[in-house]
């Protein structure tokens, strides 16, 4: 067919047919980009450990550069990086305060449950200092905190980042002292296996849904999770005291969360 004939044929098509053709072209292009993106996700996920703290990144991440983000944290956390890198430890101190410090490694939830089982009647508050870690363990710890009517706190110059705010959200009363460093970003359920692109996408979606559902059950404002989803894993969205109050991450003594029914 001559170019002029082809042009006439296109012009003679009705608008609906032209729109359908354009749609299928765009759909094909989108599918091609999706395959590329899924392959990149699969490669990235395969390289990540089973934690959302990546070993090649510092525990104290830079602030997100997204428009409207509050910027840098109030202070540098006081704990050395080597302390925060260690698997989470639990230390019961005076006043019924259980200090939870370090990375939320796989198995942290089981150790926490054992601690609560052994000393539950003495534990009134969990004080957090963690760069994050295993999402599944964070959710399990958060649920147990709520079930046992325990409060949570981030102390002055302590760090609660990545999946740590999930634990924080479980407290029946939640406080962040002046200069507490609280940050969120995208979380994922990493694996040592090499998933297919479809498996990587499915895992990311399932983890996202699981965290969103849990935060909703804990009565945390949806805006908090939106900030997390908008922030890449190598950055943090550092929350201001006003934002923590707005999203009900802190209760400020005026709003006490109702314990979950389980």
Task: Locate predicted features.
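N-terminal Lys/Arg-rich, disordered targeting/topogenic segments
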Residues: 1-16
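Hydrophobic membrane-insertion alpha-helices, especially the h-region
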Residues: 17-37
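STAS-typified acidic loop motif
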Residues: 18, 49, 80-111
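Juxtamembrane proline-rich low-complexity "stalk" or linker regions positioned immediately after a signal peptide
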Residues: 42-79
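Short, glycine-/small-residue-enriched flexible loop/hinge segments at domain edges that mediate gating
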Residues: 121-135, 151-158
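Membrane-embedded segments
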Residues: 135-146
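Glycine-rich beta-to-alpha active-site loop
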Residues: 137, 150-188
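Charged, glycine-interspersed solvent-exposed loop segments at helix/strand-loop junctions
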Residues: 191-262
